[in-house]
Amino acid sequence: VLPTLDMWNVLHGVTAAVGFHLYLMAQPPGLPEQMIAAAPDAFFGYFLDIWARDPHAIPADIRTAYLNACRDAIPSIVADYRASAGIDVDHDQADRDTGNRLQMPVTVIQQDWGTALGYDAAALWRAWAPDLHHATVTCGHFMAEEAPTDIAKALRELLTRPTTNAELVVKT
């Protein structure tokens, strides 16, 4: 996961191919929802299968729960992705232009894609969050299911890490 503006800026070549769903769901309302609704379990199941380092890491009952939830939320899921290509980019650009940065401790945990995606997630996040802790976990996209101990440890460390700032400041 990257800041939205940075995500769209790095999508080319291999990253664009991996992120094809972003382009699909960024289209105007109607067609993306219709295409996904025609075979929602195939669409969402595809990502459950290819984004997990070990597809067995997601137990059958959890997979079913994910598919059921996604099936019922197609309009909301697509709207969220659509916003990422529009208003979210505008907001990120405005924040970047005015120097707004996250002033609280931030932990970014990413799955280990190696160098396949061609960007440095920590460097991209550091531009937004000066008090950044970055970790790479050997797993696929579904980190909570595939590496629960690592994720719980990182969350405990984040929640107990003192802030380097006396107060949270957001420029307005």
What is each stretch, according to the model?
Residues 1-137, 156-161:
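Flexible "cap/lid" subdomain of the alpha/beta-hydrolase fold that forms the substrate-access gate
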Residues 131-172:
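Catalytic active-site module of serine/aspartate enzymes centered on a nucleophile-bearing elbow/loop
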